[in-house]
Every structure is written in structure tokens, then in C-alpha cells.
Amino acid sequence: MIGRIRGILIEKQAPEVLVDVSGVGYELQMPLTSFYELPELGQEAVIYTHFVVREDAQLLYGFVSKQERSLFRLLIKANGVGPKLGLTILSGMTAGEFVACVERDDIATLVKLPGVGKKTAERLLVEMRDKLKSLMEASVGSEREFMLQSNYKASEVVNTAEEDAIAALLSLGYKPAQASKAVSSVYTDGMSSETLIKSALKSML
């Protein structure tokens, strides 16, 4: 099982990245909360991974922290939550924010995420409450540290920033009209794709 990789980041197209490890390119799908934490292209990245083998594919999911990976593993064990929905949840909120939702029984916030209806949100709150006991203190305690360490540097802005942002939101399950409206409402000149995606997601929660 592949638990961690370290290599040069050679491609970034949210939510997917390509990392060169000794000449071998590893494709990973990452929640946007982790994607934002990645270094610039050409720099070394350390990514914790979760490997999934299916009949038709072998998929590698990446996370910048063990904490986020642990939460992802708990999420996909919940009834009705697969890897895709797990990524969507962790793209819409940090691990600490999800833990806070569970603590507060905050269904209203969860149902704003694509693919999470009222029944799914209620089931998540019930199932995750017990499973999160081992992660609760670490998640909440480190939330401030993660926020302070986050450094969303604007990369070189290209004409496709809006297109990239819309594509990323569509890949998470948002409808075209939702994605386009959210991106248009927050876009300002000079925004990078990553900053635009982050702002658009926040506007929908």
C-alpha cells in the first residue's frame, strides 16, 4: 500500500496533481483544502496518500496531513459515502471545520455541499460522532495552526483562471449554473485559479 510519496510537483489542475518520484509520475486526486497547501510547480511536495483498488481502476488520493487523511478514511467508512463524496466534503471545509459541524449537529452547513442531502447529513452526524473521538482534540486544536500556516500565494494569472475554477467546481459535483454564478460573483482582476476556487467555494457555504 502506498502511504506517502515525496517528489517534484510537475502538474496542478484542481483537484488533480502529478508528482514525479524518481522518474515515475503519480497522479493523485486531492481535496481542495489540501490542494491549496501545495508548493509551486517544480518544488518538492510530501503527500500522504490513500490507495484504492477497484475492478476498473487504481486510484490514489492525496492529503497534506495525516489528520486529513485519517478523517477521509473515516468518512468513506460511513454508510453512503464513497471517495468522491469524501473529497467533496473535505474540499468544502477543513478537517477542523467538519469536526465542529459534528459537534454542533450542524446539518445546515453540511447540506450546502454538493451530493450531501438532509438524510446523508443526518447519517453523517450520527455515524461520525463516535468515530471522531480519536481525532476531535487534534483537529480542533490544530485548526488555528493550519490557518496561520496557510499561504495562498497568487501564482501567475492566466486567461483561463475562471475556466479552471469552474471546471474544479464541476468536478466536485456542483451544477454548471451554480459554478459559473459562484465564480463570477467573486472574481476580480489578478486572481489566480486557486484563490478563485477557494473564494467561490466559500461563497456557497
UniProtKB/Swiss-Prot annotation:
- Any domain commentary? Has three domains with a flexible linker between the domains II and III and assumes an 'L' shape. Domain III is highly mobile and contacts RuvB.
Region annotation Domain II: residue ranges? 65-143
Q: Where in the cell is it found?
A: Cytoplasm
Q: How does it assemble?
A: Homotetramer. Forms an RuvA(8)-RuvB(12)-Holliday junction (HJ) complex. HJ DNA is sandwiched between 2 RuvA tetramers; dsDNA enters through RuvA and exits via RuvB. An RuvB hexamer assembles on each DNA strand where it exits the tetramer. Each RuvB hexamer is contacted by two RuvA subunits (via domain III) on 2 adjacent RuvB subunits; this complex drives branch migration. In the full resolvosome a probable DNA-RuvA(4)-RuvB(12)-RuvC(2) complex forms which resolves the HJ.
Functionally, this protein is described as follows: The RuvA-RuvB-RuvC complex processes Holliday junction (HJ) DNA during genetic recombination and DNA repair, while the RuvA-RuvB complex plays an important role in the rescue of blocked DNA replication forks via replication fork reversal (RFR). RuvA specifically binds to HJ cruciform DNA, conferring on it an open structure. The RuvB hexamer acts as an ATP-dependent pump, pulling dsDNA into and through the RuvAB complex. HJ branch migration allows RuvC to scan DNA until it finds its consensus sequence, where it cleaves and resolves the cruciform DNA.
Q: Which InterPro entries match?
A: DNA_helicase_Holl-junc_RuvA_I, Hlx-hairpin-Hlx_DNA-bd_motif, NA-bd_OB-fold, RuvA, RuvA_2-like, RuvA_C, RuvA_C_sf
> What Pfam families does the record tag this protein with?
HHH_5, RuvA_C, RuvA_N
* GO annotation, cellular component aspect: cytoplasm; Holliday junction helicase complex; Holliday junction resolvase complex
- What organism does the record attribute this protein to? Shewanella pealeana (strain ATCC 700345 / ANG-SQ1)
MF annotations from Gene Ontology: ATP binding; four-way junction DNA binding; four-way junction helicase activity
Could you state one GO biological process linked to this protein? DNA repair
Q: What is this protein called?
A: Holliday junction branch migration complex subunit RuvA
Where do the record's region annotations for Flexible linker lie? 144-156
The record's region (Domain III) falls at: 157-205
